[in-house]
Each structure stands twice: as structure tokens, then as C-alpha cells.
Amino acid sequence: MDSMEAVWWGKFCVWGTNKHPPLSGFPAYGIYLLFSENIKAVYILSQICITVGFCFIYKLASLLLEQRKAVLSVMLLEGCVFYGFCSPEYNVNVMSLALWPAVAYFFYRAVTENTLCLWCLAAIACAANFLNKYTAAWQLLGCAGFLFFTPEGRKMLKSYRPYVALAVFLLLIFPHFYWLWQHDFMVIEYFSSRSGGVYGQEMPLWENVLHHLISPAEFLVSMLFYGAGTLALFFAFSRSLEPEEIDFGSRRFLFWLGLFPLLLVLAYGLISGSPVK
């Protein structure tokens, strides 16, 4: 159903929908036309997204680890449900599997090499990720956190290049926000329905507190379950590998773009009590 929905969005080539930003529909409709309007072709697009994501993960890992471990970092993801069982059906989540690693890769190269070209590529990747799904904001906040709260990031802010990248990012997402303004920000209604149910009802204080605790706990347990295969493979292989020395700047980068978005999601669930996915 998500695949058909994406094709339908792409057919009308608009800058927004009632649920998500518009980007996922464009390639879906494009490949649908390329294969003579065969809806099965959209499932090929899912695997293209997975492959692109693997490529960027390998390229990023190769900047931090030796080649053998960089390859292993990609292979371990085959144990994750999102890269296997959930991957055939094309939707915004599958496209995110390509775009999140792309943002991390280009942003890492931008802050380490500080060239205008790389900053612009990072901005384009960030805009594409946001125009695919609003939850990309968690990763964008991680990028901002790295720039403002680390020595490496603050050093970059003394250059004009990050500000050019910010301008490129805002320019790319402006049409979508203009569309939202024209349509009275109709996507808010979808968000409200997703966070409705018992979470939107009046309840005793103790029950309300319990819901606020359950929401992030359920999310964390589900993520551990979905990634159980990857974790098992990691512990199996890690015994035969020597520890890798990673500099403090790279460790801070991995925290802000790897762990920090997860902490934000958990904090959102804890504060709002709404289901997080």
C-alpha cells in the first residue's frame, strides 16, 4: 500500500502531502514510468535505497576504521530487520535508510575537510532527508549539536562555508514550507491522529506518568528486538577483532549523529507520552 501511495504522490508532482514531505514520490513514479507503468518496479527501488545506504555506510566507516572492519560494519546490518524483512516494500522509511547514511557521510567529510563543495553536498543530503520524512529533524539537530557543542564544530563556524550550506538547505526546503502554508499545514492533523488514542485522553496522574514512561520504553525494546540479529553478529565477530583507536573528534561525531538522535526520540516520548516509532 505504501508503494502505491508513493507512486500516486509522485504522479501529481506536488511539494507536499497530507502525511509526509514529497520526495519519496518522485523516484517512485519515475521508476514506475520507466518500467511501462509496472507497479512491481517500485520494489526494485527499495533495494536500490538499501544498496545506496550500504555504500554510504561503508564509505563513512572506511574513514574511521580499517577496510576489513568497514566491510564488516555493512555486513552486520544484514541482521537488522529494517535491512531485510521490512525492505521489500518501498516507503519513506526505506528511503531513509539511504539518506541518513548519506547525510552522515557528507557531513563528516565537510567538517573534516571543510571545502565548499562538501558543505553544499551535505546541505543537499540534509534537505533530501528532510523532504523525505520529518523525523530527519532528529539527525539535523545532531548536526547542529556537533557544530555548536564540540571544538571541531565551533572551529567550522568561523568559516563562511557552513553558512552557505545553511542557505542552500533553506532554499531547497522552502518550496515545501510554502506548500504547507498554502494548505494550512494540513500535515499537523496527521500528526495529531498518530499521537491520539489514550495518549490524548484525560486520565489519573499515575496513569499519565506510566504512559510517559511506557512510550520510550516500548520504542527502545522494539529497536533492540529489530536489531537483535546485528547485535548478535557484532558480539560474535568482535572477539576475533582488535579494538580500533578512534580519535576524540570522531567519537564526538559518532555521538552527535549516532546516539544523540536516539536520545532525542526517547526524550520526546518521555515528555509527550505519545507513541514513538
Annotate the PLM regions.
Residues M1-A6, G16-I31, S36-K40, N93, ...:
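Extracytoplasmic catalytic/substrate-binding loops of multi-pass membrane glycan-assembly enzymes
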Residues I44-L65, G79, A102-F106:
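Transmembrane-helix motifs of polytopic, lipid-linked glycan transferases
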Residues S73-V81, C126, F130:
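Short helix- or helix-capping micro-motifs
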Residues F85-S96:
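Short acidic/glycine- and proline-prone juxtamembrane loop motifs at membrane-interface regions
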Residues L140-R251, P261, G269:
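Transmembrane-lumen/periplasm boundary regions of multi-pass, lipid-linked membrane glycan transferases
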